[in-house]
């Protein structure tokens, strides 16, 4: 899915604005590159000018290095202190969460936008020695971050409630929801949203976490095979397992075949 940022202010005034784009991943990665191309194309169409745009890269890899991201973001912002931007655009969940953990005036007061992110977010942990494999953060919707000057963006809406209702419509005897997530910030953010929704609205259902932060793809397969009766599988994300290795497409096959009689629904575009 391409995120398209449409700018509808006077073209001449845009030329005088400094725009800082901070990406979670290398700008050459497919999704990031596609989003940047669309932004530059539209911006140049409106202004005929792109020299006022600067791109920084957090070079995030996996969640095991997540405790470094807050400081990494702070250093990137510090690099632009002499000539502060008029707008900061964050591409990716890692950049977004790291930005929302900042306390500087630049981060809090500069107009900011997000893309390639969900409407829900988690803040990076304040403790330096926290174990990210067991960290259970709270989920917040982006409008709740009132101490930041968030002016807009492109957000994915993950509707957990409608998915649960769909599961109950097809399988009214469902007693357990098994949620699959991986060892990425996106996986942890989705898991936090699912936990929050289940705790607030579905206390009659039992939530089973198939957590890639602590399980390999093969361990998850075993867990799926041992799921109790009346369980539905809700798919979140699956790119990196507990071994810190990216999961290849041919390794997701065993998950989909682990228990073919267990009904499966997808919260994201994972599909499997």
Residue ranges of each PLM-predicted region?
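Short hydrophobic alpha-helices and adjacent helix-cap/hinge residues
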Residues: 9-272
């Amino acid at each position: 899915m391409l995120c398209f940022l449409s700018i509808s202010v006077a073209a001449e005034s845009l030329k005088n604005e400094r725009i800082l784009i901070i990406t979670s991943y290398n700008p050459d990665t497919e999704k990031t590159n596609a989003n940047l191309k669309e932004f530059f194309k539209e911006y140049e169409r409106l202004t005929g000018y792109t020299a006022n745009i600067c791109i920084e890269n957090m070079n995030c890899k996996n969640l095991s290095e997540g405790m470094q991201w807050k400081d990494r973001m702070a250093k990137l912002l510090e690099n632009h202190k002499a000539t502060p931007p008029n707008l900061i655009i964050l591409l990716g969940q890692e950049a977004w969460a790291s930005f929302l953990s900042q306390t500087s005036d630049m981060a809090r007061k500069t107009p900011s936008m997000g893309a390639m992110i969900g409407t829900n977010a988690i803040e990076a942990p304040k403790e330096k020695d926290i174990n990210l494999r067991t960290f259970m953060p709270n989920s917040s919707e982006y409008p709740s971050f009132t101490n930041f000057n968030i002016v807009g963006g492109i957000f994915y809406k993950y509707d957990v409630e409608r998915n649960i209702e769909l599961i109950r419509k097809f399988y009214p005897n469902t007693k357990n929801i098994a949620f699959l997530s991986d060892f990425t910030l996106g996986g942890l953010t989705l898991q936090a949203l699912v936990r929050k929704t289940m705790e607030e609205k579905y206390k009659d259902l039992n939530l089973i976490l198939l957590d890639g932060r602590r399980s390999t793809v093969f361990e998850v397969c075993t867990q799926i095979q041992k799921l109790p009766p009346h369980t539905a599988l809700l798919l979140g994300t699956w790119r990196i397992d507990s071994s810190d290795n990216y999961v290849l497409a041919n390794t997701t096959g065993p998950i989909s075949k682990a228990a073919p009689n267990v009904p499966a629904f997808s919260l994201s575009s994972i599909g499997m």
